């Protein structure tokens, strides 16, 4: 009987540890470049979760750049009118999450396509501020072109202190002006983790806890992902709640190349966000 109890305790402890990722970010700052104006609307949920994770782990001050709508050349799979909507939706995901969760008052959320020069200048500034003790981790949550333009406009000697995190070749190979190899040719470090769609693009019922949450901050995050599910440009998000790109942020806040969570889960995201909300009531 004692052995059975011990086994149960071990299993429970293991499950708890799996759901309780250790927050141990690497040194340096983080920048996020997302699309959202491409046919796939998944960056709506990804943006909301990314910002909420950074706030929930008290790392919001280390986010030094956030830009969205980085797909600079519209493709025929999304109409001009639908793409126009996406710009507004992505700005709402950024500003709405930031205001409700707090902590991002000093950060400007750039529309990369509509504020191209300002976006490149801001990311270049972050690159130029990098050093061995304060590297810049760039989360590639969209096409690589903005990253390429910013690297080209920044100081070459700073590129050795830049790390670009990616999880899917669909982003790497989607550039209109830069290939993935051309990004690496700048001398940055490639940090590649597994496809985050595996555990973070899930049946929307797995997010019912957020939909029915008592805290409106969590409901707002859920709503951003729901907007992607009801979007009518693509069909592959129907019935899904997708925050896959936020898996790269989860990887970073849990250690990145020093043991970071490479295959994030909804349970881990939930644990972090609910832990913050329970201690920071409105």
Stretches with model-predicted labels:
Residues 20-282:
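N-terminal acidic, glycine/proline-rich low-complexity segments
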Residues 4-13:
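Sec-dependent N-terminal signal peptides
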Residues 12-22:
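Bacterial Sec-dependent signal peptides at the C-terminal "C-region" and cleavage site
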């Amino acid at each position: 009987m004692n052995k059975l109890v011990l086994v149960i305790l071990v299993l429970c402890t293991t499950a708890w540890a799996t759901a309780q990722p250790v927050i141990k970010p690497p040194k340096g700052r983080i920048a996020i470049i997302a699309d959202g104006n491409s046919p796939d609307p998944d960056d709506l949920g990804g943006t909301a979760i990314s910002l909420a994770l950074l706030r929930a782990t008290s790392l919001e001050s280390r986010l030094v750049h956030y830009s969205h709508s980085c797909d600079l050349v519209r493709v025929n799979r999304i109409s001009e009118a639908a793409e126009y909507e996406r710009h507004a939706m992505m700005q709402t995901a950024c500003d709405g999450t930031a205001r409700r969760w707090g902590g991002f008052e000093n950060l400007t959320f750039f529309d990369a396509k509509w504020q191209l020069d300002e976006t490149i200048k801001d990311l270049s500034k972050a690159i130029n501020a990098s050093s061995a003790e304060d590297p810049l981790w760039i989360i590639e949550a969209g096409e690589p072109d903005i990253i390429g333009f910013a690297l080209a406009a920044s100081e070459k000697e700073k590129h050795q202190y830049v790390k670009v995190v990616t999880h899917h070749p669909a982003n790497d190979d989607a550039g209109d002006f830069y290939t993935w190899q051309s990004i690496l040719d700048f001398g940055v470090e490639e940090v590649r983790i597994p496809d985050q769609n595996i555990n973070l693009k899930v049946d929307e019922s797995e997010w019912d806890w957020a939909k029915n949450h008592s805290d409106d901050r969590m409901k707002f995050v859920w709503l951003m992902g729901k907007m992607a599910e009801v979007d009518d440009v693509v069909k592959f998000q129907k019935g899904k709640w997708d925050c896959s790109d936020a898996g790269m942020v989860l990887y970073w806040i849990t250690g990145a190349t020093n043991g970071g969570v490479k295959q994030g889960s909804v349970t881990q995201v939930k644990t972090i966000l609910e832990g913050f909300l329970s201690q920071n009531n409105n």
